[in-house]
Design a protein with these regions (language model features):
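Hinge/cleft segment of the Venus flytrap/periplasmic-binding protein
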Residues: 31, 35, 39, 50, ...
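Hydrophobic alpha-helical segments within soluble ligand-binding/sensing domains
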Residues: 1-26, 73-74, 98, 121-125, ...
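Solvent-exposed, acidic/flexible segments
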Residues: 2-9, 37-40, 44, 66, ...
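Short, solvent-exposed amphipathic alpha-helices that sit
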Residues: 8-15, 38-58, 72, 76, ...
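Sec/Tat-exported extracytoplasmic proteins
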Residues: 16, 20, 32, 51-55, ...
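Exported/periplasmic ABC-transporter solute-binding proteins
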Residues: 88-89, 103-146, 150-176, 182
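Structural recognition of the beta-strand scaffold that forms the well-ordered cores
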Residues: 2, 27-32, 61-62, 88-92, ...
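Hydrophobic alpha-helical
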Residues: 46-47, 62-127
Length: 220
């Protein structure tokens, strides 16, 4: 089981072009995939494939730094916006690079350049809330540990009762990424379940039910 990183990259590309109002000749800088990290390749491929299919005249520039820390990405983004002063947007496939790039562009006075990130972290969410509708950290797909945990339990139950048998190594269940945007930042909860509850709420309800059962047993 894993999140569909390719779909996440496509979501990021779609959000990027939404931010740019469908600019046909947009110039977008992408932090190039790291060969040793499979998910980075899927995210970048999803982004670039979607761009090629939907905006063939857009220029997508792939480049990367050997320093993947927040500070390293800050320096990288500063160099990239200097080399490509007309860039319209950046796509970064993990949180540290997202934040490093965002702050680099802000500090460089490039406050009209959009940033599409990844991981949908609380840090990114707060930047969006503080920036409001004009925030240039526009969107960020991400993964919900709680939802993945729930799905894992469901599959374990199916395995134990014999209703599910894996067909092979390629039989991988992929979950659709969550999407944090400037439009939903104030209400976004990456761990919210489809029924509106969160894992914490469900745990609390379970604990309460167990306490009631214990009380009833004691009364008997």
């Amino acid at each position: 089981m894993r999140y569909d990183d390719y779909a996440g990259g496509q979501m990021a590309a779609e959000q990027c072009m939404e931010a740019l109002d469908g600019k046909e000749d947009a110039q977008v800088i992408v932090f190039e995939e790291e060969p040793s990290i499979a998910s980075s390749g899927r995210r970048v491929d999803g982004f670039t494939d979607w761009m090629k299919e939907n905006y063939p005249n857009a220029e997508v520039i792939k480049n990367r730094s050997t320093d993947r820390t927040t500070d390293g990405c800050y320096a990288w983004a500063t160099d990239m916006i200097t080399a490509y002063p007309d860039a319209d947007a950046f796509f970064l496939y993990w949180n540290e690079c997202t934040m490093g790039t965002y702050h680099a562009l802000q500090d460089a006075g490039k406050t009209d350049v959009y940033v599409i990130g990844y991981d949908a972290t609380d840090e990114q969410k707060q930047v969006m809330i503080d920036g409001g509708e004009d925030c240039k950290l526009y969107a960020s797909p991400g993964m919900s540990p709680a939802k993945m945990g729930v799905k894992c339990v469901e599959f374990m139950e199916q395995i134990f009762d014999g209703s599910y048998t894996r067909s092979g190594a390629d039989d991988i269940y992929e979950m659709t990424p969550e999407l944090l945007t400037i439009q939903n930042a104030k209400t976004f909860d990456i761990n919210a379940m489809d029924d509106g509850t969160t894992e914490e709420t469900e745990d609390a309800e379970k604990d309460t039910a167990e306490e009631i059962d214990t009380t009833e047993d004691g009364q008997e």
